Amino acid sequence: RQMCIRDRYYTYGASFGGPIIKDKLFFFVNGEYEDNVTAGSSYRPRTALGESYSGGNVHRPLQSDMDDIRSFLLKKYDFDPGKYNGYSTDTPAYRIMARVDWNANQDNKVSFRFTRTHTKDSNFPTSSTNPLYSSDLYPGGKSNEVIDGKPVGDIAKGQGRTSKYALSFSNSNYYQVRDFTSVAGEWNSRMAQGAMNNMLRFAYSYQDEPRSFDGPLFPTVDILQDGAVYANFGADLFTAGNLRQTKVFTITDEFNWNVGIN
């Protein structure tokens, strides 16, 4: 059975600029927007016991079980874990740059620049079990199911959320957000009829990289069968409160004096 999962990448952009005051003050603005839709998981559940999941995009869980889990969570906790296959996610991005140049006079020129970027990447649930070992959490076991006339037999240790034995709901995915903002300025001045030159620069940047997820906050839950994860739902284990922020401020002053050649 084939599935059609949508992928879409459109980029829109515009630039404009010109003089605010003739020969004195100028501006320039550039902007881009990316309308991105990223395909979700291509893995699908089985429709019946006995169906093979040894290859391709078929995983062990039954479609009826995944539907029952979702129905139970909606009814019992009013929590929608999302879809388990056949979905896409929106991952928009944008970039903005603005610049102003001021020719104060023939010896002084000033410029300011502003930059802002935003990206958002979709990721499947982490397979990490840190600080515990996956073999301790998922001990493996023996399956009595028969496929193509042969018993499945032993399931190895450590078969977690991303193995062929499991499926995760879409709200267990997480987004890595990257926001970057910078402001910079420059003052270039000449003195003594050009014999002296001074360049003063400053820059401030702020990088914010939080994680986010769809749906409300809900505990991470792994349902095991035969010692291996069968279904996973709830917020990604390492996403809530996970962020990285960096602020940098720099200022430099360069002075040059041309004393001539003796």
Show where each model-derived region lies.
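Transmembrane beta-barrel wall of Gram-negative outer-membrane proteins
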Residues: 8-123, 175-204
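Short, small-residue-biased leader/transition segments that mark boundaries at the very start
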Residues: 3-5
